[in-house]
Amino acid sequence: SGVTDETVFFKYLNGNSWGNDETVSDPVCGGAGGFASDRFLDVPDVDTVLDPVCFSECIGCNESYVHFAVDADGYEITDGMRVAGSFNAWDANVDFMMDAGEGIYKMAKAFEEGTTIEWKYVLNGTTWEELGEDVCTTGGGYINRTTTVTDDDMMFDPVPCFGSCYECGGAPL
């Protein structure tokens, strides 16, 4: 189209008139424009094909978000909190979590429904949490957190403590 290095706002219509347009509030791909319900795209300087998405969603229709969260209150955090797992080749330098305040770190990531994932939280990029066999972990030689992605967005609430399956000072989740 000749438009590069700028942000464009758009939305999909179900039919051929306004009133059948989607509302996208997810800040990953939407929540923009005059009514805060448009999609946005930062246009690169190369041809780009957008991934298919579900109407009014930022992800595919067969995907759900997993909302990772961990409580690291009391730990000295100088280089952030990360998530490393089966979905990113166990690379602690790919998925950085956001500081939500009061020692809580969060991140959302989309996965295909039915996928079983394993992960650990990594403090400062080098301190991997150590977990024992418990309700939120795998067994065997490597003990990792695990879950199977359902058709609903998944949140860990209450937020587990770093290195534990439990809320800080609480009972099993």
For each of these PLM feature ranges, what is it?
Residues 33-75, 143-173:
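Primarily marks secretory-pathway-exposed extracellular/lumenal segments that are disulfide-
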Residues 1-7, 15-41, 72-114, 123-148, ...:
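Aromatic-rich carbohydrate-binding modules that target alpha-glucans
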